[in-house]
């Protein structure tokens, strides 16, 4: 029987954190991925992490008190769903985990100069100090494994294969007005042109792709084995401990031994049958999770009487999503996170042609509002010609890009008047005119008394700081007018397997199942269906991935009784 010390099921950030840490502790590691490419949701994410009091924050004079972040989390999560053991472990070990992974070269982050928590006016919130940005990475370091790295969706790439980060996006928006930005963009384009001579896409990686590529490079160099296209059929249990897995690969079934433990890091159930059961019913819903995130960990762990998290009012991390339907039947999904909703000259209206939410609040808040009333989903994001020229709208890029193909495909609507736009969208023209007129009167003064768009530091950070008197508000005046349809969507699941502070999966009696761990979206999120800030999934994923491997390295193996 083939054997390793640790078997990791899944290849996202949490799984790689466990794998790298285990390798560094002298343990042998096998990573199993169901898909033909590795990286999971993490590889197509923004890659940011939300961790308190990191070395990066301390260097910039932004050290964070543990009491402050705990107060903030308890306020947002609520007393009933707040788990002090898990929160304490995250707060106490987040900095340690990140520093360890950085020391080993597995991650590299910088402090975002301005990245407010999503509820900046609540007790314990900060405008800077917790959110970290992934430093770009050269994908060529992966060698032949670069082709196995999951690529972001086409809509998140420029020119068919170039990745950009938040800073790059700002430079592209400014390049017609700034020589510095023009120079920055020219260098990116030159690098990309060179890459395409020998690679299927750009090798300058950003965001979640940079995170996973860097972690994979280090893990593989430290001896981790990575298998793709593997289906895990069941867990092997011996004398009350998980000691291996039964798999199917290339039509052959095999049993593999895990001497120290198995880590479930398979990405949750956002793409599986469980999703419909735990999701509010809306007309259409689109997940950004890969198809392989089908709840495999739940199926595997349920056979061992594992405890699942409570069914909350929100079991997902929500986001509004637009969908481009290609002529060949393909669907291209775009999550509306930071590029358009908060910008001046952009509003959202529901089926009654009425605004229903502060458009510049977080994507989780926005999509939650879409689900609050039947008429709010799907909804429409609307802007005027000036906003389109400056910021774009979803997959529609700002000037000088030609977006006619998106209009022909029915993704982007364009009309020379609001009345004609309403007709295209199936809205009441008089109601839409009244909504826009009301918004315009207030926006001209930089105000939004109806929904307070631009009313807090997070809103303004997502807007356009050059636009005054408010970074988020400007009247919609200049024709043509544009619109796209937004559907409810998600970035992954919040509900998962209940664990200990060391990421051990607990059984129904709330006792650890020896040798079984869960991290990432397979772990019941301590956020309990809330979304306090940027990177609140990946921060805990790295932390508890690290803690799971550290715990395994300290335990006697079930087979020998000796500490590895």
Where are these regions (language model features)?
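N-terminal Rossmann-like FAD-binding beta1-loop-alpha1 element of flavoenzymes
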Residues: 6-31
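Glycine-rich loop(s) and the adjacent beta-strand/alpha-helix scaffold that form part
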Residues: 202-209, 221, 249-327, 538, ...
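Internal hydrophobic alpha-helix adjacent to the cofactor/substrate pocket in enzyme cavities
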Residues: 300-307, 433, 540-559
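A glycine-rich dinucleotide-binding beta-alpha-beta segment and adjacent secondary-structure elements
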Residues: 234, 238-242, 431-526, 530
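Extreme N-terminal leader/targeting segments of oxidoreductases
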Residues: 1-6, 24, 213, 531, ...
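Conserved N-terminal/central alpha/beta ligand/cofactor-binding core
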Residues: 34-225, 346-348, 355, 386-388, ...
């Amino acid at each position: 029987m083939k054997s390793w010390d640790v078997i990791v099921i899944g290849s996202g950030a949490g799984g790689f954190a466990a794998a790298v840490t285990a390798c560094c502790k002298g343990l042998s590691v096998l990573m199993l991925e169901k898909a033909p490419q590795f990286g999971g949701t993490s590889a197509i994410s923004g890659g940011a992490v939300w961790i308190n009091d990191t070395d990066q924050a301390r260097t910039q004079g932004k050290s964070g008190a543990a009491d402050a972040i705990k107060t903030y989390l308890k306020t947002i999560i609520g007393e009933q769903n707040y788990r002090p053991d898990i929160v304490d472990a995250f707060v106490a070990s987040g900095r340690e985990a990140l520093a360890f992974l950085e020391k080993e070269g597995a991650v590299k982050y910088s402090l975002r100069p301005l990245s407010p928590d999503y509820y900046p006016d609540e007790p314990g919130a900060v405008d800077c100090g917790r959110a970290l940005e992934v430093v770009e990475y050269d994908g060529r370091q992966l060698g032949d494994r670069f082709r196995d790295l999951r690529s972001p969706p086409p809509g998140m790439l420029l020119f068919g294969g170039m990745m950009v980060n938040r800073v790059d996006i700002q430079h592209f928006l400014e390049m017609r007005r700034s020589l510095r930005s023009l120079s920055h963009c020219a260098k990116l384009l030159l690098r990309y042109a060179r890459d395409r001579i020998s690679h299927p896409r750009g090798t300058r990686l950003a965001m979640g792709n940079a995170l996973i590529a860097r972690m994979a490079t280090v893990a593989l160099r430290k001896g981790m084995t990575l298998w793709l296209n593997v289906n895990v059929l069941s867990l092997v249990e011996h004398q009350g401990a998980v000691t291996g897995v039964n798999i199917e690969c290339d039509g052959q079934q095999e049993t593999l031994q895990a001497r120290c433990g198995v880590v479930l890091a398979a990405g949750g159930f956002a793409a599986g049958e469980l999703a419909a059961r735990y999701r509010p019913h809306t007309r259409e819903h689109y997940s950004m999770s890969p198809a392989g995130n089908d709840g495999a960990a739940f199926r595997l762990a349920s056979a061992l009487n594992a405890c699942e998290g409570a069914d909350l009012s929100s079991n997902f991390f929500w986001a509004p999503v637009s969908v481009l339907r290609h002529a060949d039947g393909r669907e291209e999904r775009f999550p509306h996170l930071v590029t358009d909703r908060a910008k001046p000259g952009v509003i959202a209206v529901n089926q009654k042609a009425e605004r229903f939410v502060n458009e510049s609040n977080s994507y989780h808040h926005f999509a939650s509002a879409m689900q609050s009333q039947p008429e709010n989903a799907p909804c429409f994001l609307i802007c005027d010609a000036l906003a389109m020229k400056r910021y774009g709208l979803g997959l529609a890029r700002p000037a000088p890009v030609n977006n006619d193909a998106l209009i022909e495909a029915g993704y982007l609507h364009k009309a020379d008047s609001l009345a004609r736009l309403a007709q295209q969208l199936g809205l009441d023209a008089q109601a839409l005119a009244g909504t826009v007129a009301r918004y315009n009167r207030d926006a001209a003064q930089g105000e939004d008394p109806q929904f307070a768009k631009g009313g807090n530091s997070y809103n303004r950070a997502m807007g356009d700081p050059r636009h005054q008197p408010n970074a988020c508000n400007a009247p919609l005046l200049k024709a043509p007018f544009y619109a796209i349809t937004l559907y409810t969507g998600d970035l992954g699941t919040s509900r998962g397997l209940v664990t200990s502070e060391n990421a051990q999966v607990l059984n129904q009696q709330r006792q650890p199942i020896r040798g079984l761990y869960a991290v990432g979206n397979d772990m019941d999120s301590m956020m309990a269906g809330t979304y306090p800030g940027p990177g609140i999934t990946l921060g805990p994923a790295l932390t508890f991935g690290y803690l799971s491997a550290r715990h395994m390295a300290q335990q006697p193996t079930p087979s020998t009784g000796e500490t590895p």
